[in-house]
Swiss-Prot record:
It comes from Pseudomonas fluorescens (strain Pf0-1). One of its GO terms (biological process) is division septum assembly. GO terms for molecular function: GTP binding; metal ion binding. SUPFAM superfamilies: P-loop containing nucleoside triphosphate hydrolases (SSF52540). This is Probable GTP-binding protein EngB.
Length: 214
């Protein structure tokens, strides 16, 4: 017998709930939430769409198109949250500051937030934004898992070397609270590992359904 990852079915049936410009517009602060963060063009929306097998998150050629906290329902207790992207140049500074204020309020005060998935473009990892998110997560005691996205853009050997290098840097600077993996949305690389992390944070790790082995 083999175990089916319990989060898989929930992700496949996920639906859009609402968008929030401010924390007081978010759903009730109960249950389990996992948030997805990343600089613009880090592949966040593509990763989220691949994990949910749907076009839930808006993808765009214009960096920073996601301007709101977008909530997606997995079941009555569990949600995924697509956070605004950062690093774009075409957005007015006052609007950036507005997003940053409310993002910080969400990250710092959300009791149902159980973990943070941080997307880094494997070709440009550890940007200033990434370092800020790492500092915040460790200081807040928030579990973080990093997806080194667009791993298909490098050879496997080069991707593996980057993974080991970034992993070593993170352990030295931030300890073992942060985990990391390779990920590619087009190649569907790293899905099972990411699902396992989500299941653990959402307390589904021991609820796998047994399936006949193929």
């Amino acid at each position: 017998m083999q175990l089916k990852n319990p989060i898989l079915g929930l992700c496949q049936q996920s639906t859009f709930m609402l968008s929030a410009a401010k924390v007081d517009q978010c759903p009730d602060d109960e249950g389990f939430e996992v948030a997805f963060a990343g600089r613009s063009n880090a592949g966040k929306s593509s990763a989220l769409n691949t994990l949910t097998h749907a076009s839930l998150a808006r993808t765009s050629k214009t960096p920073g198109r996601t301007q709101l906290l977008n909530f997606f329902k997995l079941d009555d207790e569990r949600r995924l949250v697509d956070l605004p992207g950062y690093g774009y140049a075409k957005v007015p500074i006052p609007l950036k500051q507005h997003w940053q204020r409310h993002l910080e309020a969400y990250l710092g005060g959300r009791e149902s937030l159980k973990g943070l998935i941080l997307m880094m473009d494997i070709r440009h990892p550890m940007t200033d934004f990434d370092l800020l998110m790492l500092d915040w997560a460790v200081a807040a005691g928030m579990p973080m898992h990093i997806l080194l996205t667009k791993a298909d853009k490098l050879t496997y050997g080069a991707a593996k070397n980057t993974l080991l290098k970034v992993q070593s840097e993170i352990r030295k600077g931030w300890g073992d609270q942060v985990t990391i993996q390779l990920f590619s949305a087009p190649k569907r690389m790293g899905l099972e590992e990411a699902y396992t992390v989500l299941a653990g944070w959402m307390e589904l790790a021991d609820k796998g359904a047994e399936l006949p082995a193929e």
